[in-house]
Amino acid sequence: MRSDISLDEMAAELSRLADLSTAVPLPESEVVALEEVIGAPLPDEFRSFLLRFGRGVRPGPLLDLHWIVEETQQEREDFQEEPEVAAYPWEPFPVTRDDVRQLRRLAAEEADPTLWMDKPSPGTMFLCSHGCSWISMLAMNGEYAGTVWLTEMGWVKDMSWWPSAPWRDVEPSSRLHGGWSEPVPFLDWYTRWTRQIVSRHWRSRQPDFS
């Protein structure tokens, strides 16, 4: 699934929103090393982002690649202890169009637009932490490859999944979805979140005349 925004369009927008000098592109060798840790090729948009912008640009979100590696390695160790819940990035990502239609129905009914799974989702990799055990995961393959999903890593029996939408600025206690039901590809996800962060910073600097 491709983003509405292209990498060049994203660069143009980020040059207006953020400081592109803070972007440090990753060399190909480091991207390959990350893929070796993950055990699967990175989705095209995410891979291109790393090669062009590295971890990201300030004041937008910065990806913590060391955290991604550490969480991946720790999860592999956990799976050795609990093989019945093991799920790996190279396995098929299970979310289908029917699942997404279900999310839309739930949102229309003002219910939580979440998908229940009894274990971590195969076909995903760690992307970023939102604090505590709230984690955005990147779909690695399938028709929703490159989209970003949120879960609560409470290890591990009752896990729900939903499209990650951190730009909605909802507290973790509200499950960070705020009714959002549409899968969002990585470039769109990063751009929307950066817009929200920049807007919030701008509002915080405005004088209060009340």
Tell me what each language-model feature is.
Residues 3, 7, 92-96, 176-191:
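Intrinsic-disorder-associated interaction segments
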Residues 1-128:
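A surface-exposed partner-binding patch
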